[in-house]
């Protein structure tokens, strides 16, 4: 309906905005369906990983590349601080599932922390473990909601759209990789 509106086709800028709405809504619905399918597989034990050597930094960079232009169009700056790739050895994991985690967290940062108009991402090594940090500079998460944000279907007080299962799926994927998925309020504001 958006493109079929005769008023839009006369104005190229309005047409571009209409197409952007369609793309964003398609992406949102596709993500929601994928999350629901993954959640169903996790619940009945059909969720599996395709384990191989994975360059964690390259997977994060792919996710950043996927979202950078979308964020720019929404007025959100996405800063990336790469680690020293030579010092980050491959890990054993599922590259697609790890990229799914990064994309979901980046999307959440934009939805819930977008008011800060800035998101930063980094990868590095701490105490022998590879660590990926994604931070928004928005209002953060109310302290009373922090213990629940990774629970299935929990949406908190945020008005942002979503299924409420994305972070639960991310948490499960990271656990299946032997990792830890933490969410906290960042010093100086925002969440990471």
Show the residue positions of the predicted features.
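Short alpha-helical segment of the dimerization/phosphotransfer core of two-component systems
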Residues: 24-29
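Conserved micro-motifs of the catalytic ATP-binding
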Residues: 44-49, 90-93
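Short conserved segments within the C-terminal catalytic ATPase subdomain
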Residues: 70-81
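Short conserved segment of the HATPase_c
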Residues: 141-153
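Short alpha-helical Gxxx[C/S/T] motif in the catalytic ATP-binding
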Residues: 166, 170
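Glycine-rich ATP-binding loops of the HATPase_c
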Residues: 178-184
């Amino acid at each position: 309906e958006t493109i079929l509106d005769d008023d839009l086709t006369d104005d190229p800028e309005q047409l571009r905005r209409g197409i952007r709405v369609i793309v964003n809504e398609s992406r949102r619905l596709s993500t929601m369906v994928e999350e629901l399918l993954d959640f169903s597989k996790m619940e009945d034990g059909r969720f599996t990983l395709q384990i191989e050597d994975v360059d964690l930094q390259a997977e994060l960079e792919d996710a950043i590349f996927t979202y950078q232009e979308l964020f720019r169009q929404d007025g959100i700056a996405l800063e990336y601080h790469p680690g020293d790739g030579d010092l980050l050895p491959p890990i054993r994991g599922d590259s697609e599932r790890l990229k799914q985690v990064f994309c979901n967290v980046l999307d959440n940062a934009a939805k819930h922390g977008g008011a800060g108009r800035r998101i930063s991402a980094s990868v590095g090594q701490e105490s022998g473990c590879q660590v990926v940090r994604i931070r928004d500079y928005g209002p953060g998460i109310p302290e009373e909601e922090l213990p629940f944000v990774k629970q299935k279907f929990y949406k908190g007080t945020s008005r942002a759209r979503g299924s409420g299962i994305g972070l639960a799926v991310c948490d499960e994927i990271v656990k299946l990789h032997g990792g830890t998925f933490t969410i906290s309020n960042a010093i100086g504001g925002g969440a990471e």
